[in-house]
């Protein structure tokens, strides 16, 4: 009998350790029970994955939720699903293609005209490790969608957010930002050989730098902005990595994926927390890893890099030339 005790003990320890690791990786549910009745929320990329789950969570809490997506067919289905699950009729789909500056401006104009307020902006949409594609305006796709598109959208909606204060901006970054570097000599990957992983890391570093710089410019406005790493989730974001398309990887790495990958529902909890938690009302310019505040990479803390990136981004998206736009110029001088 005693010869079975050691194997059983080892198996029990392994199973227990696996469960604890799974719980740690998952990060848990949003600890805040706050509701947001009467508040208007915009979630980009909300037709699937983390974005859809974030929209669902905020609709459950009573928000007027706008799903801003490129694929309107999928977006309408997502909005219908959320209305059905939450019984909240104030959930709708609007077209927003972050790979098109024209589409971003059209969306912003529509929101400014039709919405009395914008209380929460969740910049969630992203592409990851795609081929060397470019946006409608010629920007490298990951830099254009993950960062530049949200940079323009946020600036165009700033006046509405300020008028709705206290309001919040949540920017989804990634742990991958720590491997990123802002190459001001070739932001658009036109001179060097394209590296899709490095391009993704650069785009996510840009998101954190944008968050830091914007928080300085928003001081005293009643608008806060924070960035977060939601965790690694099982979503369509990784469709270009090849991991989900390989039978071998699915078989060999399936247990690893199960252990270390969050469900979209759990990955949406940090965004929900930053959007609603009363204790975070005055917190701004911070980076969160899941539900916990954490120091970002050293380059993400470089104020000179952040200011330079802002100036270059404004030039690239034409903010200074957007005469008559509510977000023209640098929006809030610093």
Curated annotation (Swiss-Prot):
Substrate binds at residue 174. One of its GO terms (molecular function) is all-trans-retinol dehydrogenase (NADP+) activity. It catalyses: all-trans-retinol + NADP(+) = all-trans-retinal + NADPH + H(+). It is found in: Mitochondrion inner membrane. NADP(+) binds at residues 45-51. GO terms for cellular component: mitochondrial inner membrane; mitochondrion. Its EC number is 1.1.1.300. The modification N-acetylserine is found at residue 2. It comes from the Eukaryota. The active site is at residue 200. Pfam families: adh_short. It is a peripheral membrane protein. Coiled coil: none annotated. Keywords: Acetylation, Lipid metabolism, Membrane, Mitochondrion, Mitochondrion inner membrane, NADP, Oxidoreductase. One of its GO terms (biological process) is eye photoreceptor cell development. Pathway: Cofactor metabolism; retinol metabolism. Its main location: mitochondrion. Retinol dehydrogenase with a clear preference for NADP. Oxidizes all-trans-retinol, but seems to reduce all-trans-retinal with much higher efficiency. Has no activity towards steroid. PANTHER family: PHOSPHATIDYLINOSITOL-GLYCAN BIOSYNTHESIS CLASS F PROTEIN-RELATED, RETINOL DEHYDROGENASE 13. Belongs to the short-chain dehydrogenases/reductases (SDR) family. This is Retinol dehydrogenase 13. It comes from Mus musculus. The gene is Rdh13.
